[in-house]
Amino acid sequence: LGDAAAERLRALGHAVHTRAAPGAVQAFNQRAWPVISSTGLAHVLQTHDRIDRLTPALADMLARGRAGRATDLFAAQALVRQLQAALADVFRAHDLVLTPTSAALPWPADEPHPAHIAGQAVDGRGHAVFTAFVNACGLPALALPAGWAQHLPVGVQLVGPTGSDARLIALAPAWEAANDPATPRRWPLH
């Protein structure tokens, strides 16, 4: 998937370089995002009148957020600032970052998340390791269809530095035009 997406970008006239993710991304995903997402949910649902209708996964997340400590949230915010600095270094050398949109192939619609990815047990956010850090840093990103894997639709994400929204949007039509004509424009729903 990544190689094919990189080749498509090259065919569209872009230089593509492989680089390991900054270590700050993994630290963020492991230590900061669980705190930020659960406390954020607790904040948003302070006045929600239908908490009894939450899925069990969201109810658990809400309970963690309500039990969270301010010191944990401040530590998570410090990790976000470290990640922002690490990504600023990346964007000094590269215009955009290419990642998968998800760490997992599509899973059944009646399941809240995949239980395993690449043979490893994961929690409810295991599939989102490529998007959570982008959201927390407030960076623009574009999800693009990238074909099929094991007969399932998959995508890639292009992430840009702050203020690069127009660059990302301008790239989308060229990406779409380079799609394999056999790729359906709408994925069949089953």
Identify the meaning behind each predicted range.
Residues 3-12, 74, 85, 135-190:
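Structural helix-boundary/capping segments
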Residues 95-96:
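Short, Asp-centered acidic motifs that coordinate Mg2+ and/or phosphate
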Residues 35-88, 100, 104, 143-153:
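Short helix-loop capping/hinge segments that flank enzyme active sites or metal/cofactor-binding pockets
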Residues 28, 107-110, 153, 168:
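Short glycine-/acidic-enriched loop or helix-start segments at secondary-structure transitions
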Residues 106-128:
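Short, surface-exposed loop/helix-turn segments at secondary-structure junctions
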Residues 26-38, 113-115, 157-159:
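Short low-complexity, flexible loop/linker segments enriched in glycine and/or proline
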Residues 1-32, 66-68:
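Gly/Ser-rich, acidic/histidine-flanked active-site/gating loops
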Residues 88-89, 120-145:
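Small-aliphatic-rich amphipathic alpha-helix that forms the alpha element of a beta-alpha
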